[in-house]
Amino acid sequence: MEVDPGSDDVEADRETRAQKLKLKRNVKFRAQMRRFDEYCGVTNLTVDDLNWPLISGIPLQRQRLTGATYYDDSLLDQNPWDEFSIDRFLEITSIQLITAGAGYERNDEITRFVFQRTMKTIVTYCNFMYDLARRNGKVQITRFELQDLIHRDEFRFYMYFRQFLPNPDPNCTAFSNHYTSLLHTLYFNIPGMPQFWNNSQMYNYAATRGQRLVQNIAAFYPPEYFWNEDESKYHTTFVVPRGTEFSKFYARRFHEALGMPPLENEIITVLDWLAKLCILEIVYHTTIWCDITGFGGLPRIEHYRLAMENVEDIIFDLAIDDFSISRLQLQISPFEISRYSPLDVSGYYETIKRKKDIEEYQNRFYEVHYSDDVRIMNVYATDCSRKR
């Protein structure tokens, strides 16, 4: 039997390519870790907060979550990473706080506190899902662990069902069966769930929050806020920075800021959605805390810190540490009890128009914050086939 003398060269070339690929992955990993260290000054996260090992050369698997395509090259952002600043995430947080009724002008202290609390919460979710994935014999977070997390709250799972409804996938029957099983358990095993699911009263949970937050907007925001027809600010998130389309560049930066959790690629869009819900809940919880304590006005930074002092996870009730009042070392100033009154709008027709604008905004608040379709679903109306 003769051996092809060129076979040794082919094998050597294969080993050379493998070494180059490994070297490329190591260089990329070191760059990601360097950026994570830079982000830590703003996110207040450390490596000790992460349960997953930071190992070089473990790529994320390309698997579908919703029918959207995370690896759509036509939407690739060409921005170089070294031109990105983590302060951009603070700007996005500020936009979300304004639309949630926290205040018309940006407050850097409140923005930083809410952003750090949100990032800590999302990392806690990733730790929970990663530990669950390891118990299931997996090396990364999959959509199964994601649904087990969201299933802890029936209303949030319904929101997830509405916004991330997966398309039928004949190649992933296990996921379809798991998804259907969770829906079945949710529908039949929770008392009153059939009525909640099929009745318009299911919106009351979010409508109550929206109504209270709109009261702040109506009392303290200028009339020009209601006349602005640009609704992109309502859809602005960490991975949709312009409020119009999904950005792979920002999704990668958001993933790096979280400490690069090992997850299926498109789960980053759901984590971004959970981050938006977390910001809304923090604003609402602090507003209600101010109502109970008798403070009449927009919450200040000390109110946010005191309101969130004994609160763990604001959505799924997971344990979150390192946010105690002693660690923050607050300098609390005395509360200023000042009852607010409606804005003085001169002119009958201006008053009528303002009331109408506020009513229309309140009716739209639930839609843009809780039930509006995720913008990326319209962007990713593409073929979901993969090149494995």
Swiss-Prot record:
Keywords of the record: Developmental protein, Differentiation, Repeat, Sexual differentiation, Spermatogenesis, Ubl conjugation pathway
Keyword Repeat applies: yes
Residue ranges of the TM segments: none
Function as written in the Swiss-Prot or TrEMBL entry: Required for male development. In XO (male) animals, fem-3 directs male differentiation in all tissues. In XX (hermaphrodite) animals, it specifies the first 80 or so germ cells to be sperm. Negatively regulates male development when bound to tra-2. Together with fem-2 associates with the CBC(fem-1) E3 ubiquitin-protein ligase complex which mediates the ubiquitination and subsequent proteasomal degradation of tra-1.
InterPro entries found in the cross-reference section: BBS5/fem-3
Positions annotated as Sequence repeat: 7-10, 110-113, 141-144, 234-237, 284-287, 371-374
The encoding gene: fem-3
Chaperone keyword on record: no
Originating organism: Caenorhabditis elegans
Protein name: Sex-determination protein fem-3
GO biological process assignments: cell differentiation; male sex determination; male somatic sex determination; masculinization of hermaphroditic germ-line; positive regulation of gene expression; positive regulation of MAP kinase activity; positive regulation of meiotic cell cycle process involved in oocyte maturation; positive regulation of oocyte development
Subunit (UniProt): Component of a complex containing fem-1, fem-2 and fem-3. Interacts with fem-1 and fem-2 (via N-terminus). Part of a E3 ubiquitin-protein ligase complex, at least composed of cul-2, elc-1, tra-1, fem-1, fem-2 and fem-3; mediates the ubiquitination and subsequent proteasomal degradation of tra-1. Interacts with tra-1. Interacts with sel-10. Interacts with tra-2.
Result for mutant: residue 299 to S: In allele Q77
GO molecular function: protein phosphatase binding
Gene Ontology CC: one annotated term: protein-containing complex
